[in-house]
Amino acid sequence: MKFIIFNGSLKADSESNTFSVCKMTQLAFEKLGHTCEVVTMRELDYESATSDVNDDLKPHIMKMFDADGVVFATPIWWGTHSCHIQALLERLDFIYSWAKDNKYQPFYNKVLGTLVSGGGDGFQHIHGVLYSAASNFGFTIPPQCNIESKAQGIEEIKTDEDTVNQVKNCAINMTTWARILKEGNPTKDARHGSVDINEEAAGVGIVTKQNATKDVPVGGEYMNVKKLGLSK
């Protein structure tokens, strides 16, 4: 399977603790037999926007459609994630809008993890913000896929037991849940938008001529809800 790590560090790779943990995570995926690419965003010439822009970042965004999982990696800066990861969220906004307009969520069969490097407060807030955004984008968030590394410097990072264990948890759980999603293909039966062809199966919405069935006639939305044991 394929995984992408977006490194949102503000420092050069040679000086970045975040990049060091990214490389550890990349190695963990590779040891499990999967491919993993680390994209250092500060090295790209990209535009801050909420629209589809042709620049250095776009090809990496497009790779997300073929990937099985994505990791957002960031240091803690003033209690929150870096400007590069914020820019990535903003650049994904056009996909979010497209998904709503076309009633199809392209990231439903994909998993997401987060990686936060830093010794100060803020990691829980960062995980929460990124998970909220990822959920709205359609990603599935497996358990214990939130890496928090307080270690400083590559040598300390490599030998820090907490960092090593969290990296292992993240890589193993992301690949496990990605495989489950790949085999189960929830995209097929999941609800993709505010109006969806599967709504009659979910017991919501108004039954029309287009989605009526022999068991649920036109106007029979209340009966459909009762049949599923749901309250009106």
What do the PLM-derived regions correspond to, one by one?
Residues 1-102, 157, 161-232:
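N-terminal beta1-alpha1-beta2 submodule of the flavodoxin-like/Rossmannoid cofactor-binding fold
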Residues 18, 51, 122, 127, ...:
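Surface-exposed beta-strand edges and their flanking turn/coil or helix-capping segments
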Residues 103-147, 162-165:
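Short, glycine-/small-residue-rich phosphate/pyrophosphate-handling segment
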